[in-house]
A protein has these predicted regions:
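Extracellular/periplasmic carbohydrate-active domains that bind, remodel
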Residues: 1-383
């Protein structure tokens, strides 16, 4: 493969439609450089135009797949520097929810991706969207406003490090992940911090801070301008559509959750199998509505679940408990549970070690509830 080099964007604001990314090319934004999306939807191209062979691109209409910067089957491509890529919150009346416009970045079937140092602001849909990428690193990014921050559907050997998210929708989302590390990131959202909607193996979420309420409103909430942060970590393959496969070798370590409705929810659905889920060194404060939970509602139990050195402090559930009743299968978010602290459903081989649950306001239900849980080991659990 020939060619390559660096394209330098100097100081200034540059209005543009779609830019096609090429292999072995680094797009470098100098300090105070702004690449801004033009308010003309006809100037944007769709990833569907570049890749018409993959059936799943056609799940969404062509205009949903438009982006400010996009590439298909590119390798060793990078976007670096200190500048800003501004999606400009351009609305498309024919888009999703009658308002979503182009993504900022969209890559498909690509390898060797590096995005570092830049600021992604006001995405008209997702800041970064991709299908089937490998060897991608996201480092020292600031992602603000818009909808999802980084959304990857099909990713292998991915690193998301030292990034700061202040998003209107999920900070990081997607699935079909293998060997993904999310490390030392700050997640602020008016939706969820990390939402997994398809299977994943070898996922590590380490040294991350999840803090609400959202700096920017959930754009889809319209006049409500809702800002409450829902869940910190939401692992729920199959909640939005059938997504068969495994959720295994998941490590969530040294993470903090503050002023969220719910700290974490792990749920398996039909066609999912799960094992070796570890949550350790977890601290949750000022949790507001729903208990943390690990659940399987599919055709098999979730095996080998370990919670170690976990401290969760709730300020009150505000009517989110259903005392004495078996909860329903969750849909796409947390829901009412029969306890205020920790709910486990259809699990096998569970270890709870140094787990502390605190409710700072009136208790109307048990601290925890175990439903169809076998082989439980409990060491130093208090509430």
């Amino acid at each position: 493969m020939r060619g390559g080099g660096t394209v330098i964007i100097p100081e200034g604001t540059f209005l543009t439609g779609s830019i096609l990314l090429k292999s072995k090319v680094n797009l470098f934004l100098e300090s105070n450089a702004v690449v801004k999306g033009i308010n003309n939807l006809e100037k944007y191209r769709s990833i569907s135009d570049l890749n018409q062979d993959e059936a799943y691109y056609k799940v969404k209409p062509r205009n949903w797949n438009k982006a400010l910067l996009l590439g298909d089957q590119v390798e060793d491509v990078s976007i670096t520097g200190e500048g800003v890529i501004d999606g400009a919150h351009i609305q498309d009346k024919k888009g999703e929810e009658g308002m979503r416009g182009p993504h900022i970045l969209f890559l498909s079937r690509s390898k060797g991706i590096k995005i570092s140092g830049v600021k992604l602001r006001r995405a008209s849909n997702y800041a970064f969207m991709s299908y089937d990428i490998e060897r991608a690193s996201f480092d020292n990014l600031l992602v603000e406003e818009g909808w999802d921050g980084i959304h990857i559907r099909g990713g292998k050997d991915i690193r998301i490090r030292n990034c700061r998210f202040n998003t209107g929708d999920d900070a990081v989302a997607g699935g079909l992940w293998k060997n993904v590390v999310i490390e030392n990131c700050y997640m602020n959202s008016s939706c969820n911090g990390i939402r997994l909607i398809m299977p994943a193996t070898g996922l590590k979420i380490v040294d991350c801070e999840f803090r609400g309420p959202g700096k920017y409103p959930h754009r889809t909430s319209g006049e409500q301008k809702r800002r409450n942060m829902l869940s910190g970590i939401l692992l729920q393959p199959g909640a939005w559509f059938p997504a068969f496969g495994e959720v295994k070798d998941i490590l969530i370590s040294s993470c903090s959750f503050d002023q969220l409705d719910n700290p974490f929810l792990v749920t398996l659905n039909e066609g999912n199998r799960g094992e070796r889920i570890c949550l350790e060194h977890i601290r949750g404060t000022r949790l507001m509505k729903a208990a943390a939970s690990v659940e399987s509602w599919g055709d098999s139990s979730l095996k080998d679940v370990r919670l170690s050195d976990v401290s969760l402090s709730y300020v009150g559930n505000k009517g989110q408990e259903i005392v004495g009743r078996t909860p329903s299968k969750p849909l796409t978010d947390y829901r009412a549970l029969p306890c205020w602290g920790l709910y486990l459903h259809n699990l096998d081989r569970v270890i709870l070690r140094n787990v502390r649950l605190v409710c700072e306001r009136g208790k109307v239900s048990p601290a925890s509830c175990f439903d169809n849980v076998g082989s439980v080991e409990i060491y130093n659990v208090s509430f």
